[in-house]
From Swiss-Prot:
It holds the Pfam family Ribosomal_L34. It comes from the Bacteria. One of its GO terms (biological process) is translation. Residues 34-44 have a biased composition (Basic residues). Keywords: Ribonucleoprotein, Ribosomal protein. Residues 22-44 are annotated as: Disordered. The gene is rpmH. Belongs to the bacterial ribosomal protein bL34 family. GO terms for cellular component: ribonucleoprotein complex; ribosome. This is Large ribosomal subunit protein bL34. It comes from Laribacter hongkongensis (strain HLHK9). One of its GO terms (molecular function) is structural constituent of ribosome.
Amino acid sequence: MKRTFQPSVVKRKRTHGFRARMKTRGGRAVIAARRSKGRARLSA
């Protein structure tokens, strides 16, 4: 049986990357929340 997680750096960055987050209002909210929490990594 094929596993569900088939890693790909390109797909990861395109879906969860910083620029992808900045494109939508909700994504910007995510970045803001992570900034206020003091996360070391804001996005993938």
